[in-house]
Curated annotation (Swiss-Prot):
Pfam families: Ribosomal_S20p. HAMAP family: Ribosomal_bS20. The keyword RNA-binding applies. Keywords: Ribonucleoprotein, Ribosomal protein, RNA-binding, rRNA-binding. This is Small ribosomal subunit protein bS20. Binds directly to 16S ribosomal RNA. Belongs to the bacterial ribosomal protein bS20 family.
Amino acid sequence: MANIKSQKKRILTNEKARQRNVAVKSELKTAIRAVDKAVAAGEAEAAAAALRTASRKLDKAASKGVIHKNQAANRKSGIAARVKALLG
């Protein structure tokens, strides 16, 4: 445990940020799973809607620094390709 006051504050701040990041990453996984589930079921409309939601969440996570922008782009292109294959 740190002895310096500012470091004690940083420990608390870092823990809050870590928990927020874990929650956001969990939301991302859920959104991507929703896309995969819709694609597996062959539901084109639901897959397209889930793709829009997941893309928005990925962009927001990248802009907030939760994930890297290249990782967001890579994940978006992957789910978009799966949806596009479903749509034909």
